[in-house]
């Protein structure tokens, strides 16, 4: 069996940008942190501006680097979102299953993505916080219906418990355009996955740069 190192040397590394969108406090940062580090912190601070992390993923026939952009959900930053979508291959639109308003806003986030990228982007609609079933306000069926209407993929997860988080990113990676794994392995069960490569992660805090860009380009009221 080919080692991870051998595969990395023999397979060209393709990079795909994924932007994570959604209202404030739907758990965007928690989703990313669970995927990257397999940890959860109840006391995360709200993202200001944008953060960037990347992770190398090994599929059966491909090696890719997924570059994940964690965006702020505050209204004052929305005018900058299109600029971060322009070269993206995928967008995760997250909502909180315990807050109906975040689900309603998810359709607006999807519209922003489609307006900027059309059909040249993979959209994954993600209902977060399934660990709080007793507080659920948005049904699984509602999420599935929105995904069908918007031609998006759909999954429910819990960043807190880790439920379905790896599966979310597996499905996203599988759907990336131009990969042998995409063409040959349409079922999730045939997708090879290595969760051992945590040394390929990079974290950059772009808060200051984002704030300067905001002040320079955005005319939104603050």
Predicted features by range, described:
Residues 88-107, 117-120, 131-137:
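Conserved Switch II/interswitch segment of TRAFAC-class P-loop GTPases
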Residues 44-79, 86:
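Switch I (G2) and immediately adjacent beta-strands of P-loop GTPase domains
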Residues 29-41:
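A conserved segment at the C-terminal end of the G1
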Residues 1-25, 63, 120-222:
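Conserved P-loop small GTPase signature centered on TRAFAC-class small GTPases
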Residues 23, 42, 97-99, 181:
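Short, conserved catalytic or interaction motifs in soluble domains
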Residues 76, 80, 102, 142, ...:
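Short acidic active-site motifs
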Residues 22, 27-28, 72-74:
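Conserved phosphate-binding and hydrolysis motifs of nucleotide-dependent enzymes
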Residues 68-69, 92-96, 125-128, 156:
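Conserved beta-strand segments of the P-loop GTPase G domain that flank and frequently precede/overlap
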